[in-house]
C-alpha cells in the first residue's frame, strides 16, 4: 500500500519468483477480481482506495491448515505404520522435571508418573526454556512471553490470507487477515502483541512464577529491554498493542490499522475474538544482549532438544520436525528414509 511498499513488494517478487515459480504479482485490477475488499474504499464498492497497491501471491497453494486435526492424523498414521510397535500418546501429563540418568532420560509428571526415554524432544512452547533452565541448560537465554489476540468479523471479507508488509524492526508477524476455517470462513484479523507475565494464556496465574524464572532477569535482560524501548517504532508499537486490549477503545484503534487491508472496515464489522491466540516465547540472548529474531533450539546435551518457536510458529513446525527427526535417528542409530519422506510430504513440482 503506497508507492514505497509497492516498490518493495515488486522488488521482492523479482527476487523470489525463481525460487517460488508459482508466485504471481497482482496489480489493483487483478486484486479487484481476487480480493475486491482490498481495492474499494467504501462498502458499496463504488470508490477505489486512492493509494497504489500491489500484492504477491498464488492461486493454487494452500494458505490455511488446521494443525490440530493434522496432528491427530499424523499420530494415527504413526500408530498404524507398524502395529507390532507400541506408540502411545499421553494427555494431561504435564512434565515437572527431566533428569539425565546414564544414557537415558527420566521424565517425572506433576501427578508422579515417570517415563524413561532414549531421546527427548521438548516442544512445550514457552515452557521449553523453563524446563531447560531446570536442567541447567540455556542459561544464556531469557524469555519474554508475548500474547497474540485477534478480532473476527461478522461475515466473509477475504478469500485468502492477506498480510501487510512486515516491519523489519519488529519480531512479530505483521497484521494479517484470513478466513478462519473453524469459524465458517469469517475473517480473522491479527495478531496483536502483548507482553504477559505468564507462560500459558487462559490458565490464570498458574505460570506467573515460572515466567519470572524463565525471563532470567538481570542486567543483560534490562539492557535488552532498554535498547528495544529506545527505538520509537518499537515503543509506539508496544504502547499501541497494549491499547488494543483495553475495552471501550480497542476496537476503534484496531480498525484503523486493519483498514490498511480492508479500507471499508468499520467498528461494527468486528468483535474481539475471546479465547483466540496463545503465548509465544520471544527469546532474549543474554550473551549478545539482544532479542533473537526467529526460533531457537537448545541442543547442548546429547539426546535432548528444547525448541522455542516464536511467531510465526505454524509456518516452520514441520520443517523443524524434519530437522529434529534426523538428529533423533542419528542418535539412536536408526535410518531416516528421506526419499520416502519427500514423496509423502512434498509436491514434486515445487520441492
Feature annotation, model-predicted:
Residues 55-111, 115-119, 316-329:
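Helical element adjacent to the flavin cofactor pocket in flavoenzyme catalytic cores
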Residues 35-81, 86, 237-242, 301-309:
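Helix-loop-beta segment of a Rossmann-like dinucleotide-binding subdomain
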Residues 214-337:
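C-terminal catalytic lobe of FAD-dependent flavoproteins
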Residues 39-42, 99-106, 284-285:
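A short, glycine/Asx- and small/polar-enriched loop/turn
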Residues 24-26, 88-90, 271-273:
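General small-molecule cofactor/ligand-binding pocket signal
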